[in-house]
């Protein structure tokens, strides 16, 4: 059975599911180059031949349950507790006697219980309401939260994810720049109290925060305080849910879980017998996959499980380029000679992380490497860069915190060596992808050769795009990035071809 699904929120996507597994996943922003954009007509042209006929259904928006379903079906667990934390989900009706007629809130935190094939139950939910809905409660002497039912709490305070969004817009960033705020937290020198009154209602900007955080240092200090407050809240939510249900299989989804610092903090504080799966495509770009998978299991009743193997789900790209024939060893030597090399393979990664199919690579040993790559991409100089390390060497170079692996770059880990300064953030940490040969054989072979030459089994890895643009989807996108920057080469390992930039020449 084939199922095609689409999500037209921000981060719009289309997904084609064949027999329960993702066949194609197209992210609108990669097609129209509008960051976090909604669906566009061009997105659908990739699916025309797959859906010549069939039944079209519009399913009511149940935003958080689609997040939860996505993480559950990718986890491989038979049953699980699914925790969803994001900016905001769908609208929920709230009415008298507590609220005005016609009032609505939005889901911000949800906890579901999932079991195969498609049995699910809402266990807990937090709903954010606009300030003006709360007149009745405010008249009773203050408002911070109300348990309308045992499993639902209504509040006027933003979710942890939207706190980041609101802080970003209040200091002049885009709402989706939470990653920058997380990077700034490491430069903090002082503690600043996070006042929840600054996060009341739906408005994505706080005038009070704008006034309070006028300098870069104040913004860094606040970022750290916000990071600490949010990760503590999420950790407590997960621990309480485990305690109340007794379930120790935990799936995490929603855009908040792109916060690698928080993920590591939560991991360190969970009991060792708890099994955790973080959905790598946990933002709204994964909604169409969650919808399709939930619908497939509802229609088929299948109990077959498909644990996630990788997220290279983009449209297969034809690679017809002219260049120099090379081996992985040749390219590894260029990396060792401190050339900046893009790597492009047929199918792009789903989600925001570049995992070796749409990456810019560099020698992590260069003490000026971070500044060089940030300048090349047009990024702020305070932002860290990630690394990909061969799985079998990871524990020698990073404090793995008892993690078996980190294949989707969802954890921030302490760097154990001074030999790789280019990947070290100011706090001596790095966002890490551990790589097995079975996950991406061409990428693995390149790093293996780099290790053979240098004795360092890892490379600096950042996404194949420049600041303000989206990650390259097509060969044309990648060539534009190559020739519009100070990159040296673009490597197509499936073809064994290396293309020099117009500046580098042959």
What are these model-predicted stretches?
Residues 43-50, 68-71, 237, 241, ...:
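Stable alpha-helical structural segments in soluble proteins, enriched in small hydrophobic residues
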Residues 1-3:
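Short, hydrophobic/aromatic-rich segments at coil-to-beta transitions
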Residues 30-53:
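N-terminal phosphate-binding loop and adjacent alpha-helix
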Residues 45-60, 246-255, 342:
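Short glycine-rich phosphate-binding loop at a beta-alpha junction
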Residues 5-37, 65-194, 258-259, 263-506:
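Flexible beta->alpha loop and helix N-cap segments adjacent to enzyme active/binding sites
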Residues 180-229:
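Active-site cores of enzymes that catalyze phosphoryl transfer or operate on phosphate-rich substrates
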Residues 218-219, 226, 230, 254, ...:
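Secondary-structure capping and boundary motifs in well-ordered enzyme cores
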Residues 224-250:
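Phosphate/ATP-binding catalytic cores across multiple sugar-kinase/actin-like superfamilies
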């Amino acid at each position: 059975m084939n199922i095609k699904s689409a999500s037209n929120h921000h981060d719009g996507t289309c997904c084609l599911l064949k027999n329960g597994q993702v066949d194609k996943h197209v992210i609108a922003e990669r097609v129209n180059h509008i960051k976090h954009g909604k669906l566009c007509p061009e997105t659908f042209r990739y699916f025309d031949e797959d859906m010549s006929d069939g039944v079209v259904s519009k399913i009511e928006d149940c935003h958080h349950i689609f997040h939860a379903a996505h993480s559950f079906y990718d986890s491989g667990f038979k049953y699980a507790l699914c925790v969803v934390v994001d900016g905001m989900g769908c609208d929920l009706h709230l009415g008298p006697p507590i609220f005005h007629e016609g009032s609505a809130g939005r889901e911000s935190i949800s906890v579901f219980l999932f079991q195969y094939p498609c049995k699910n139950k809402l266990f807990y939910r937090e709903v954010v309401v606009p300030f003006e809905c709360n007149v009745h409660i405010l008249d009773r002497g203050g408002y911070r939260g109300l348990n309308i039912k045992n499993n639902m709490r209504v509040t006027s305070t933003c979710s942890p994810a939207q706190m980041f969004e609101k802080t970003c817009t209040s200091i002049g960033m885009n709402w989706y720049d939470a990653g920058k705020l997380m990077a700034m937290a490491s430069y903090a020198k002082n503690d600043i109290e996070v006042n929840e009154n600054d996060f009341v209602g739906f408005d994505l900007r706080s005038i009070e925060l704008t006034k309070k955080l006028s300098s870069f240092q104040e913004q860094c200090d606040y970022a750290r305080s916000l990071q600490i407050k949010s990760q503590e809240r999420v950790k407590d939510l997960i621990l309480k849910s485990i305690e109340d249900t007794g379930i120790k299989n935990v799936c995490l989804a929603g855009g908040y879980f792109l916060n690698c610092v928080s993920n590591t903090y939560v991991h360190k504080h969970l009991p060792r017998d708890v099994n955790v799966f973080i959905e790598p495509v946990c933002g709204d770009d994964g909604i169409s996959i969650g919808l399709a998978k939930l619908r497939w299991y509802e229609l088929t009743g299948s109990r077959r499980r498909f644990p996630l193997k990788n997220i290279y789900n983009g449209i297969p790209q034809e690679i017809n380029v002219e260049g120099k024939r090379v081996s992985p060893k040749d390219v590894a030597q260029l990396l060792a000679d401190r050339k900046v090399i893009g790597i492009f393979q047929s199918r792009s990664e789903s989600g925001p992380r570049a995992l070796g199919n749409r990456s810019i690579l560099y020698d992590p040993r260069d003490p000026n490497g971070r500044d060089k790559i940030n300048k090349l991409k047009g990024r702020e100089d305070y932002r860290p860069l990630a690394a990909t390390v061969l799985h079998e060497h990871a524990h020698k170079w990073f404090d793995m915190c008892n993690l078996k692996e980190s294949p989707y770059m969802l954890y921030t880990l302490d760097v154990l060596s001074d030999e790789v300064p280019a990947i070290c953030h100011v706090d001596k940490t790095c966002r890490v992808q551990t790589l097995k040969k079975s996950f991406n054989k061409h990428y693995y072979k390149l790093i293996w050769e780099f290790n053979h030459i240098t004795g360092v089994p890892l490379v600096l890895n950042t996404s194949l795009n420049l600041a303000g643009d989206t990650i390259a989807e097509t060969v044309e996108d990648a060539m534009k990035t190559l020739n519009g920057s100070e990159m040296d080469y673009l490597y197509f390992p499936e073809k064994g071809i290396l293309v020099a930039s117009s500046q580098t020449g042959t």
